[in-house]
């Protein structure tokens, strides 16, 4: 750049003690703006940024900008129309400073040291909250340009620097909300400003998410609903699905990963569809960040706003489900996460939302809307009476059928936990066999998803355990007899689940194929060292000994002719010995868990002695087991 020429052109502004003393008629103003445009363009070159920082020009620009904005905001001696010149000067100076600090920490420090804190925290925040400059709205384009450049300045100052962002966040978060609120119904007329503003708010909220007003949360949900209706179907490249899936399985991104390229001015036409998609992604991320991270949100006495928020989110999901657009999977997951986190807040009873959710379940085919509704309903059940009340609004059969529509792993969370809460001994008895088959099909499909989303495993196992516990043994036997693959599904869920299933099958008094029994015993005895707590806890050991005791007491379930030929003696005698050795070591323990396990072990030992007492020829392993059993007495 021709640095001397630029300095010469800016001399009247730079040398004046106050910018108010500088001539601002059209000729002079046009000259200043032209020189600053030249400077802003030249600052796209990194070497030129170094020059303005080291020569003091940047320092002077900060001073001029603060003076100009102070006149705009506080000087009542000049008319609003006369202030337009100062707003135009401010706009160009903001542009120059924004470009000067791109990827330049030295210049960022110059900005701070020269009074930049007040400039950024107060004056730029004020620019973001401008609604108009002139009463006739004739300068709306100037306001738009001022605000867009201010957002760029803030973004270029913060990007890649956590400390700067944390310091700026408390002062800028509110003005950014105001900026977005004023554009809610006209965002397509200033798309670049809105997208950049929402992106900056996204970064700000990552470090400053507490104490956001409930009304602002409602505003975000309202804005999301509006954008959702404007999103249009879009042809995506074949590779995008894979890219989206990979991104969506990543938890909240680290600050350092939030882009490494500062915004450098460009003159391009904004694609309306891209604006909707980008804004939808940014705002859904903003809302999710707040409701997921801020545990102090208090929804007390805000029931109507909460209901409206959840309605907005569910309607957005319904609207978006049938559309194809960029980052769809990420957005849909974030929206159900928003609904789930709002409903999980301890100050939210979710009772008002029950009608909305049951209506959604009965009328909608949108899997993501259904998932959100199931999450909300799940969080509305906190007691047995809550469960009874909810089942008057919707039946277990209806809920089970809804589960067939779920596909995305994240959609299953509310379904699994809600069913677990609602199932009990009484209503399980009346479940139709078709519903039970459907339920197990859903659980198996969900089980396949746990390979990719491990967080589902505990929810699935808990529901499976509850289902096996409350179902009559005859129904479990009929299920397994009709579909042998159910046994392998149960067995894959480990010791406790297999013990519950085995107990029920033993109680049914009906014979099962030996393969089914073997599969369960293999799962029950899938341990290496009982002494390692992480391998098997007291609770699991209690259930194993309980199941072994029941089995040995009534070994007729194996259809063996000779008691000594039962499957535990034939195939699992080493495991049985290891269990008894471990339990025997609990003999002197006084905790209830150890005492219960020891009592079960003593019961098993008595049965073993009864089995072998009339047997003339024992193998060495059986002799060792007999001696071990005697040690319990």
Q: What positions do the PLM features span?
A:
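Eukaryotic acidic, Ser/Thr-rich intrinsically disordered low-complexity regions
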Residues: 605-633
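Eukaryotic intrinsically disordered, low-complexity regulatory segments enriched in serine/threonine
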Residues: 260-269, 582-585, 617, 631
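C-terminal structured domain segments
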Residues: 572, 576, 580-603, 607-609
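HEAT-repeat alpha-solenoid elements in large eukaryotic scaffold proteins
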Residues: 29-43, 87-100, 147-157, 197-205, ...
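Alpha-solenoid HEAT/Armadillo-like helical repeat scaffolds in large eukaryotic proteins
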Residues: 12-16, 63-71, 122-127, 182-186, ...
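Eukaryotic tandem repeat interaction scaffolds
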Residues: 340, 358-366, 375-392, 397-408, ...
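Fungal intrinsically disordered, low-complexity polar regions
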Residues: 242-266
């Amino acid at each position: 750049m021709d640095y001397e020429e630029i300095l010469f052109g800016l001399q009247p502004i730079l040398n004046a003690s106050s910018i108010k003393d500088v001539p601002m008629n059209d000729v002079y103003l046009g000259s200043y703006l032209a020189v600053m445009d030249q400077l802003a363009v030249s600052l796209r070159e990194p070497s030129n940024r170094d020059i303005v920082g080291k020569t003091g020009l940047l320092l002077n620009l900060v001073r001029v900008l603060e003076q100009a904005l102070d006149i705009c905001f506080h000087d009542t001696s000049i008319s609003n129309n006369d202030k337009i010149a100062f707003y135009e000067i401010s706009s160009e100076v903001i542009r120059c400073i924004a470009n000067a600090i791109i990827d330049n920490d030295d210049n960022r420090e110059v900005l701070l040291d020269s009074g930049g804190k007040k400039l950024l925290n107060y004056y730029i925040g004020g620019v973001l909250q401008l609604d108009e400059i002139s009463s006739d709205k004739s300068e709306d384009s100037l306001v738009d340009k001022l605000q867009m450049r201010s957002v760029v300045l803030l973004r270029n100052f913060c990007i890649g620097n956590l400390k700067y962002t944390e310091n700026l966040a408390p002062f800028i978060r509110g003005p950014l909300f105001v900026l977005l609120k004023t554009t809610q119904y006209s965002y397509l007329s200033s798309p670049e400003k809105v997208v950049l503003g929402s992106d900056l708010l996204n970064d700000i909220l990552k470090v400053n998410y507490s104490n956001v007003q409930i009304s602002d949360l409602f505003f975000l949900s309202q804005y999301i609903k509006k954008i959702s209706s404007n999103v249009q179907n879009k042809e995506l490249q074949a590779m995008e699905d894979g890219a989206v899936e990979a991104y969506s399985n990543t938890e909240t991104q680290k600050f350092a990963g939030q882009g490494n390229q500062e915004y450098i001015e460009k003159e391009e036409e904004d694609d309306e569809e891209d604006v909707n998609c980008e804004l939808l992604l940014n705002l859904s991320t903003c809302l999710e960040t707040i409701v997921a991270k801020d545990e102090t949100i208090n929804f007390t006495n805000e029931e109507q706003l909460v209901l409206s928020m959840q309605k907005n989110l569910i309607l957005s999901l319904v609207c978006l489900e049938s559309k194809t657009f960029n980052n769809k999977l990420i957005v849909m997951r974030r929206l159900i996460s928003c609904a789930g986190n709002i409903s999980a807040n301890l100050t939210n009873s979710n009772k008002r939302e029950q009608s909305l959710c049951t209506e959604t379940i009965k009328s909608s085919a949108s899997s993501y809307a259904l998932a959100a509704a199931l999450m909300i309903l799940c969080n509305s059940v906190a007691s047995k009476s809550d469960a009874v009340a909810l089942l008057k609004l919707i039946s277990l059969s209806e809920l089970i059928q809804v589960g067939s529509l779920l596909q995305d792993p994240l959609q299953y969370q509310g379904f699994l936990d809600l069913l677990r809460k609602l199932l009990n001994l009484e209503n399980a008895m009346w479940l139709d066999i078709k519903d039970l088959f459907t339920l197990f099909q859903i659980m198996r499909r969900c089980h396949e998803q746990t390979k990719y989303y491990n967080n589902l495993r505990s929810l699935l196992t808990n529901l499976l355990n509850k289902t096996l516990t409350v179902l009559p043994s005859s129904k479990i036997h009929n299920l397994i007899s009709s579909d042998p693959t159910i046994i392998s599904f149960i067995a894959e869920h480990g010791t406790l689940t297999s013990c519950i299933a085995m107990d029920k099958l033993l109680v049914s008094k009906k014979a099962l194929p030996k393969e089914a029994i073997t599969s369960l015993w293999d799962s029950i005895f899938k341990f290496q060292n009982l002494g390692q707590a992480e391998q098997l806890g007291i609770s699991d050991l209690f259930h194993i000994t309980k199941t072994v005791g029941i089995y040995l007491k009534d070994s007729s379930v194996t259809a063996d002719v000779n008691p000594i030929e039962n499957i535990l003696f034939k195939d699992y005698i080493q495991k049985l010995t290891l269990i008894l050795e471990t339990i025997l070591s609990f003999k002197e323990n006084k905790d209830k868990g150890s005492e219960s396990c020891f009592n079960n072990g003593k019961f098993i030992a008595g049965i073993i002695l009864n089995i072998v007492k009339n047997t003339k020829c024992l193998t060495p392993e059986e002799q060792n087991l007999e001696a071990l059993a005697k040690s319990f007495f």
